[in-house]
């Protein structure tokens, strides 16, 4: 690949930086790593040195791809993202920016002559010509900062995400003189979410780009009279993919969960709305009572597609592709007409991701996990589904971000061998890698082998299990093994790449890595996925033991460890009390130890209420206060999955919590947790460690005070990996 660097690019980058910020406050630039690898061995340091490619955008003329790459400095304990460009065939890569502060959200102008981007919480634009950026102009001045933005098709308007005060209060809200007092005050549920207290709510604002510097007083909150009451976009992961501009720029479709407090905590009822800019009216798109997200307009604006789950309270329900016809208000006496709502993907027993309309509006492209691999599919208006990418291609493909004139799709892909790169997928399903961001590093590594196996379960089903072998594997030599216990519990072990649970890294340390897609995984149809709900101590645990039995039968396997995060951590704590002598050591990250206590302290209550055995037994009566006296309802919420439920599945669930079997613990265990984890609070990890100590079990506790459910800061991540492998080596290699 040709790299266009040198004086011209650096001069343009310097000009850009001088126009954006005070040079004295500019942190050091972080660029690609020049790491040299000894003996071809992958290490945690190698993993963290890789560039992370994201957010590709095809230019309006189809000639260029704009994308971002983040590089990490372990010494500075941070990452920095800059913008890059290549031709649509992957050639002539050029670095557009060289900033010490991250630049993200790069977007083309409608004529392709300007690039807009986000830096330091504000939006800028710079002219683009001959592969270079000119002097940048600041477009926004929003004191609360901007997290993301999108432009209308004609660039005359902008949507941006910022924040307003949330439901959690501080002492100074009651008495301004107490400006140094620190406390959080809540009067309803959902007072914290994922890793933060709800001091602020994300809101989406609409503003004109042709009226000078965009400021809050020139912006319209898209929620109108509901401003400050609800989230838009949905926390904690949502962004502006939950909004969509109509092709003529007169309507905005968006996804919003218009609930708060207890109602929010127990419900997944998120709906699609259409905001009509000329009239200021908002219209509800009728759909189910579960998650409805990610709306996408057809090229002519006559149809709207979106993703939908049918059942309220079930966040792992099948993700369906819905479509509706939308007629302009001008054709219906000033009222927007939404008709012909259809479930388009009924023939597909899989979750739809990232729908993208074809240019002619006659099909929709999307990605989906099917039979353990994520592929690219198309669907017609009649609901006929066709897989484009080969069934035997061991990659995970993302949804297309662009389509060339010859019908070639531009997308991303990854595998267990390499992180995300850009790829071109031709109409016949063949594909070519476009970018090679980390080739200079990965080419130094010794190759390894992966096998696809099917394990027979206790009830006679075939379970897809990936097995990775160490580089230069010799079957006459004995190796320790790691069995990965999946989190979720709904998720999949496919060909994804992770910067924490990296299976290539594990194999490189001399381990055989076993990845069983046990009950509850999402790449094998909804029946396989749903079986786990209400059956945590059941068949999926037997699936793990079946996979362990399979690998231990191999003559080249010595000791076996079981490791997992989140539900995988729950699985570790549960198996610790029932496995007998199957495993030689355990590692649990952010695991559930006491299911009953977790119900009292987690934040998204719909999840345990459903998955702990309540299933569809959810109801809310507005205005109802206090216990209803039926042993299930509390505070107006019917909680059939609660510890006080009288249904058999929840009673079995809590009776078999990992904490119930601690007297049988005898296997060395490492417990890791982040203190900012509000999904599974860190006292769960402390309780597991304390228990192991009291049982006389060799154990270790690692708590990261600044991390959430994930470990994100570079030095913390490095320490996490070192601790992980030190523990495995101590108990499995000795």
Residue ranges: model-predicted function:
Residues 515-734:
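Active-site-proximal cap/loop segments of hydrolase catalytic domains
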Residues 26-30, 80-81, 163-214, 218-225, ...:
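Predominantly five- to eight-bladed beta-propeller fold
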Residues 75-81, 118, 196-200, 263-270, ...:
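Short, solvent-exposed loop/turn segments at conserved positions within beta-propeller repeat blades
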Residues 437-559, 565-566, 600, 604:
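Cap/lid segment of the alpha/beta-hydrolase catalytic domain
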Residues 55-57, 159-161, 184-185, 190-203, ...:
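Non-catalytic accessory segments flanking enzyme active sites
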